[in-house]
Amino acid sequence: MRNLTLLTDLYELTMMQGYFKTDNNRTVIFDAFHRKNPCDGAYAISCGLEQVIDYIKNLHFTEDDIAYLRSLSIFDEDFLEYLSNFHFTGDIYAIPEGTVIFPREPIVKIIAPIMEAQLVETAILNIINHQSLIATKAARVCYAAKGDGIMEFGLRRAQGPDAGIYGARAAVIAGCVGTSNVLTGQMFGVPVKGTHAHSWIMSFPDEYTAFKTYADLYPDACILLVDTYDTLRSGVPNAIRVFKEMREKGIDLKGYGIRLDSGDLAYLTKKARKMLDDAGFEDAIISASSDLDEYLIDSLKTQGAAITSWGVGTNLITSKDNPAFGGVYKLAAVMGDDGTFIPKIKLSENSEKITNPGNKTVYRVYDADGMIKADLIALADETYDESQPLLLFDPVETWKKTLMEPGEYSMREIMVKVFDKGECVYDSPNVMDIQKYCKQEQATLWDESKRLINPQVVHVDLSQKLYDLKQELLHNYGREKL
């Protein structure tokens, strides 16, 4: 477990010293949330909570940390002494990993003294933003493949080792069947996948010898890369020759097939499929890679490409077309002298950047078929009775309303307590269990909300009490109703 305490922006520490010097360490509430889904999609996938937990558990300043901060000539000795005994004492609530999430709802909620809550901002956003981005991208890629296996192959193109390790973790959570990243496999117990490179073929006197040698070594996982020289005139015929020889030796062919990494994948795979089928290898896998993303996979599926397994690298591990997840961390409440929270709101000329005040939680509302109808952000002390009608309304265009009668809906609170007074009270599931949960979550989204282009938006509504509180604060600040 690494100590990432100094993985923070300098201004978090200068603000901490300011709070320390002014004796202002009252308890506050911060919300981490995102304003816009990646890739113009209708949803995102929450990911990274396990690493947030590890970070908080190991949060402390070492002697070397203190010495470095002292060398900056910014911090006074009394503040450095405070840091030398620092540990997290607050509460954390979060939406579990693998959950489908939507804009403006809290993903992580911190309730802690302001110096503690301020310090952890940067690292929490760094972890959640990265893994939620890659998980969301992977979910889109898996959806485009329509049930075919997606393998994460992006390590060499990731923006550094950590991005490769944790990006692969996020990709598997969102639905990838495995990763080429061996260290991720070791760390998180996820399946590792791989075949061979063009260099393997080129290192032998000829393609057939390369294929035969590989098949002799790995008869139970014999996927042969057929595009080193000429896919249809050399690669596929040589692969078929090797498969025939394996069958003649009595080898029970399983997990075998070919991979293409270049060329017109729709044309080549259809031709290769016919060649394999005509030779009696109808169950041979055809795998493809070559700068794939969800849009190209969708196009290839539409064209009838004979691909059943996909290796996706650069465009997945970097989320190349949308390389950042816009998570933010905003103050929602400050504890007053009487021990109650005073709600706070951040104003903006852009209405979507006006925050939701107070101590909040999130409820998921399902229709009678178990599909997501909406999410409802409510104040933490609110409760709901499913035997009563539920009124949902758009928090901006308030005339848009839906009344759900008992029996037409169900609800569940999707935030869970993770830390209580600095102690972790949450057991993180293993990655494959999170993947199973994530698949169940995605199954509650309508296909219209999962489509790649112009998806149907899932509404995130406010409870009446939260809406009224927000309007009251806006009125107090002289703003018109929003």
Give residue ranges: language-model regions.
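Gly/Ser/Thr/Ala-enriched C-terminal appendages of enzymes
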Residues: 1-26, 39-41, 279, 292-482
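Buried, small/hydrophobic-residue-enriched core segments of structured protein domains
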Residues: 1-27, 36-38, 74, 80-89, ...
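N-terminal, Lys/Arg-enriched amphipathic/low-complexity engagement segments
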Residues: 28-84
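Short amphipathic C-terminal alpha-helix that caps PH/PH-like domains
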Residues: 56, 120, 124-128, 438, ...
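Short coil/turn segments at secondary-structure boundaries
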Residues: 67-68, 136-140, 154, 450-457
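An N-terminal, globular interaction/scaffold subdomain
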Residues: 54-59, 94-97, 101
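Structural motif
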Residues: 149-152, 191-194, 221-224, 256-257, ...
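Short acidic, Pro/Gly- and aromatic-enriched capping/linker segments at domain boundaries
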Residues: 92-98, 411-414
